[in-house]
Structures are given as structure tokens and as C-alpha cells.
Amino acid sequence: MNKQIQTEADELGFFGEYGGQYVPETLMPAIIELKKAYKEAKADPEFQRELEYYLSEYVGRATPLTYAASYTESLGSAKIYLKREDLNHTGAHKINNALGQALLAKRMGKKKLVAETGAGQHGVASATVAALFDMELVVFMGSEDIKRQQLNVFRMELLGAKVVAVEDGQGTLSDAVNKALQYWVSHVDDTHYLLGSALGPDPFPTIVRDFQSVIGKEIKSQILKKEGRLPDAIVACIGGGSNAIGTFYPFIKDDVALYGVEAAGQGDDTDKHALAIGKGSPGVLHGTKMYLIQDEDGQVQLAHSISAGLDYPGIGPEHSYYHDIGRVTFENASDTQAMNALINFTKHEGIIPAIESAHALSYVERLAPTMSKEDIIVVTISGRGDKDMETIRQYMVERGLAND
């Protein structure tokens, strides 16, 4: 494995040619303050102890690494292990980062938070930590996503957050990020922007990756305990890329195949997809340079996925870099492939995954049978499917797989 891989952003915040700080001048003081505060917190054993305390006592970490015996047998394939981020408090990986950033904001003396959310999971995680630490929170959420995720909207409001509907553009995650950034610019003195994915201006991609890396660190120690060796392949779904970077990062310099699974929506032969790597090109959005779905004139295109958490038109700068150097392989799954995998997996394992996670499972169902039965695959179940029950029900009813 190539040990020359760049695993930290350079002093200007770039991974290779991706990353940076493409923000208005008015935001630079806040960005500089955040970078300095994070560097100090990262080196402070007391901050790390506090983070570990809440991850253990509040979130419920470590999450299990479960051998999927029935699923493995049904595929007649390599051994499949599940990293159970669905078992975290709030039901997804998002809490790992929300908790870390809330502690950081508290350390910086910020009493208010602003966040964006797509599927609502990051919004719920942010509202949860805001309630825990007695902070005010404003969440921007696309109007389309609000329709798809009513349950999570109510959860956020019950937890005390103010949810603001974003009607601009497509009314999805990308538009919510725009509004959250605008809000931060005008409230920068007392507000921390709790960014939910591994993107945005430096130092956000690094901060989010570091707080999510607990996933990969646990996988490493758990698989060594269970199997006495590292896995042959690791698979995670990818939107902006936070669960995937947290899963992959501790293995970047190991001899382990890493697969990120993008959302192909209605198919990679249509324009209704979220294939930032698969069909995109480098560009700048939301303060960072990364792969984007854009036209020849550099206009960012609308992303589509049945999963509200994957319909983002970009993929974080570190993933963009790992794609270019060939360290991570990017595959995809369509809406139909993901839903079929979700139904199949649920029937075998008694675990209903989030539709996001089902994209990763769809690729596992293609990959695992091509490997030997002695091989080991780990797939990150990034969240549970409670939030998606209405979408799943509609999908099955429309296809005669369930009664209306």
C-alpha cells in the first residue's frame, strides 16, 4: 500500500487539489478562529476525555460489529460484518460529529448553533446535543426533504430546535447548506455552524472526519479481535461523505480495498442521479473544491436519490483526492437496487437499515459473491430505517410487494 498518501490537509486546507477556503471575506475570521480552536482541542487530553465520556455514556459507543450469518449464507459469499451505527443514540452516525462539534462550540464560548440537514438525521443529532448542552439551534432543511421526513422534523422541534424550510432551488440538502452558510455569516459572533458532512471550507472536512473516525477505529480493533486480521474490503454509502470517510480513514494506509457507493437515482444513464464522482467533475461549492455534478458551464446540477441523505451534488474534498489517486473505488446503486437490497437484507437479518445504508448493501450483494468464502467484508450500516418507513411502504405498495 502506498505510504505516500496525503492524509492531512496542507496549510491552505487542500487534499491534493481539493478543499481550500472559498468563503466570503466576512467569514474568514470565524474560519481562522475555528481552525485554531480545533487544533488546541485536538491536542487537549481533557477535551478528548470529555468527548469519549459522552460517546460512551450518552451515544452508547462502541457500536457492535455484527457477523451477518444469514445474509452471508444467502449470498454464498465472503463473510459479511455489519458496523452498527444504526444502534447509536438518535439512530445514525451523525451524532458522533454533532457531539464533537457541540463540545468544540462550548469550548469556544458559542451559545448558539446553526445546521443544515437532508434526511433530518444530522438535524436530529444537532438538536439532541443542543438540548443536552442548553444551546439554541436553527436548522435549515429543504422543503422537499421536509415532506419526505416529517417524523424527523417533529423530533427536532420536540428537542427545541427551530426548523426553517428552504424553498430555493430544488428544496433539498444543497439549498439548505446555502442558507445555513448565509445565516452563519450574519450571526458569526455567537453562533457555530455545525456542518454535518465532510465538506465545506477547511477546517470542516478535517473536523468532521476526525469525529467520525471513531467508526473505523472501532472496526479495526473489533475485526482484529474477531478474525485476527484486517478485512479484505470495506464498503460504505456516500453522499457528502461523512460516514464513509469515518469508516475508511483509519484504513487508508492498510492493504484493504475501500468502496464508496454513490446514489445512481433513476440510473446512471439518466440525469436523475447523485453521481458526483461517477458523472461529475471538479468545481467549487459551499466553500470547497471537490467533485460536483455540473454542466459544461460549471452550473451545479440538481442531484436525485430516493434517499434524502444522498441527494447532494458534491462529494467532500478528501474523497475527491482519494478517487484521483485510486485509493478508494467509487461504485453506485440506483434507487431500485438500493430498495431491493434493503428488502432482502431486512428479511435475512431482522435489521431495517436506512435507505442510505441500503446503497452500500446493494454493492455488497454484487461484490461478496465474487470473493472467496474466507474473505471478509465490513459494511457500515450508517443508520436505521425508522425515518424511511413511509418511503419504503410507498415503494412496496407501488410494486405490489405490500398492501396499501
UniProtKB/Swiss-Prot annotation:
Pathway: Amino-acid biosynthesis; L-tryptophan biosynthesis; L-tryptophan from chorismate: step 5/5. Its EC number is 4.2.1.20. Pfam families: PALP. Its cofactor is pyridoxal 5'-phosphate. Gene3D superfamilies: 3.40.50.1100. InterPro entries: Trp_synth_b_CS, Trp_synth_beta, Trp_synth_beta/beta-like, TrpB-like_PALP, TrpB-like_PALP_sf. It catalyses: (1S,2R)-1-C-(indol-3-yl)glycerol 3-phosphate + L-serine = D-glyceraldehyde 3-phosphate + L-tryptophan + H2O. The keyword Lyase applies. The keyword Amino-acid biosynthesis applies. Keywords: Amino-acid biosynthesis, Aromatic amino acid biosynthesis, Lyase, Pyridoxal phosphate, Tryptophan biosynthesis. One of its GO terms (molecular function) is tryptophan synthase activity. PANTHER family: TRYPTOPHAN SYNTHASE (PTHR48077:SF3), TRYPTOPHAN SYNTHASE-RELATED (PTHR48077). Tetramer of two alpha and two beta chains. Belongs to the TrpB family. This is Tryptophan synthase beta chain. It comes from Staphylococcus aureus (strain MSSA476). The lineage of its organism: Bacteria, Bacillati, Bacillota, Bacilli, Bacillales. The gene is trpB.
